[in-house]
UniProtKB/Swiss-Prot annotation:
This is Small ribosomal subunit protein uS4. Pfam families: Ribosomal_S4, S4. The gene is rpsD. It comes from Amoebophilus asiaticus (strain 5a2). GO terms for cellular component: small ribosomal subunit. Part of the 30S ribosomal subunit. Contacts protein S5. The interaction surface between S4 and S5 is involved in control of translational fidelity. CDD domains: S4.
C-alpha cells in the first residue's frame, strides 16, 4: 500500500477529526464522505480499534509495516506499550522537524528531511523515520539557512510549544530535552485500542 497523498479533507471527514490540521471541509460536513456518510452506525469494538490505528497511521504518515514494526518494538520494551508507541512516533525525525515549527505539516517535514536540508548533531540525515534520542540537536544545513524562502517560513511560525523540545531561533537549532509524556502529545489517539488490536 502506497502512502496516502490524496485529499486531506476526505480523511479528516472519515475520522471526524482534523487529522492534518484545521479543516474548513470538516466544519461544513462533519460526517464521513460517500453516499451514506450521514448515516452513522454504531461501530463494533474491532472497527473502533481499526479506526484508531488508521488515524495514527495517517497522522504520522506511516505505512502498515512501519507502524507494526514500531508497535512490536514498543511491546518488547518495559513500560506502557501504548505510551511507548506514541513516544516512538513522536521522536521520528520528520515529526520533530514539524513539532519544532520548521515546517507547517509533517508531510513537508518529510520532504525537507528527504531532500537533505536537515542535520542531526551536525551531520545530514535524510531518513524521515530516523529515531532521535534525548540530547540530539536538530538543525538546518548551511545551504538551507541561506534560503530566504525557508528561513522566512520558519521565522513566521511560533516555536517551542512542546516542553520536551527546545528551539534556539538565533542559531536555528532544536534540541530533544526529554521524551514526551502522554499529556504532552495533543493528538486524539486512543493508543489502548491499538494495543488491543495488535494483541489479538
Amino acid at each position: 500500500m502506497a502512502r496516502y497523498i490524496g485529499p486531506k479533507a476526505k480523511i479528516s471527514r472519515r475520522f471526524n477529526e482534523p487529522i492534518f490540521g484545521p479543516s474548513k471541509a470538516l466544519q461544513k460536513k462533519n460526517y464521513p464522505p460517500g453516499q451514506h456518510g450521514k448515516i452513522r452506525k454504531k461501530k463494533s469494538e474491532y472497527a473502533i480499534q481499526l479506526m484508531e490505528k488508521g488515524k495514527a497511521k495517517y497522522i504520522y504518515g506511516l505505512l502498515e509495516k512501519q507502524f507494526a514494526n514500531l508497535f512490536y518494538k514498543a511491546a518488547k520494551k518495559k513500560g506502557v506499550t501504548g505510551e511507548l508507541l506514541l513516544q516512538y512516533l513522536e521522536t521520528r525525525l520528520d515529526n520533530v522537524v514539524y513539532r519544532l515549527g520548521i515546517t507547517p505539516t509533517r508531510r513537508s517535514a518529510r520532504q525537507l528531511v528527504s531532500h537533505k536540508h536537515i542535520t542531526v548533531n551536525g551531520k545530514i540525515v535524510n531518513i524521515p523515520s530516523y529515531a532521535l534520542k534525548v540530547g540530539d540537536i536538530i538543525g538546518l544545513t548551511e545551504k538551507t539557512k541561506s534560503s530566504n524562502a525557508i528561513t522566512e517560513r520558519i521565522s513566521s511560525h511560533s516555536h517551542n510549544k512542546n516542553n520536551w523540545l527546545e528551539w534556539d531561533s538565533k542559531q536555528m537549532i532544536g534540541k530533544v530535552m526529554s521524551l514526551p509524556h502522554r499529556e504532552e502529545i495533543p493528538e486524539k489517539i486512543n493508543e489502548q485500542s491499538i494495543v488491543e488490536l495488535y494483541s489479538k
